[in-house]
Amino acid sequence: AAEPYSSTPARPLVMELAQFAKRQRTDGLEDDGGRVQRISAQAVQRICSDQVIIDLQSALKELIENALDAGASKIDVRLKEHGVELLEVADNGKGIPVASRAGVALRHHTSKLEEFDDLQRLRSFGFRGEALNSLATLATLSISTRTKDDATGALLTFAADGGVAKSAPVARDTGTAVSVAQLFGPFPVRRRELQRNATNEFRKMLATTQTYAIICDAVRFTCVNQLAKGGRQVALQTEGGRGGGG
């Protein structure tokens, strides 16, 4: 017989709900008789974000696809503690224009399409405008970027709603680096689950990177993991430059 369907975040989500119920009891909150109420905007954002980014692998997938959409010929994946402390994807693509930076991590903001009919002409991976917004909600998100027309780069840090909390000049080459620190930090149970499964999560991330490297063989990929004791593990390095991919 086929195994019943199971979703990766199901167990942590159940545990989160159990904790919520416990807090209600200990805080002395009374039952309101089942009255239907509007969910707060903050709660909706956190719930939806948890479905877009379910693990480190899905976060990495979204960031690699953003880099490919930017026309990158080089993509560097940098991890700290197998991605538990930090996941960073840097590329040498076209960068994020100044006019687009304020909305780059806002929900349903995208440079890929404006109207539904644009889907017929879409030639990119991402288009929903949800990934970066979800990462801003689930982690500490920062982006450094520069276009060929910029005199200098910019380092953007984001609030939980995806708005730019701070922007500062930074020296860097043309391209973009997206840093995701402390993924699932606002969700203690999910965070502990990630820490316990760090090695398996790393294997899945590496397999994802290898898949894109095989398909997009014109792009040079590297994946480096930095350990707590100062060790540095080069997990993947490809030559790129082949004509068949991309």
What are these regions (language model features)?
Residues D118-G246:
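Glycine/threonine-rich ATP-lid/beta-loop region of ATP-binding domains
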Residues L17-Q24, A59-R121, S134:
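Conserved beta-strand-loop-beta-strand hairpin that lines the nucleotide-binding pocket
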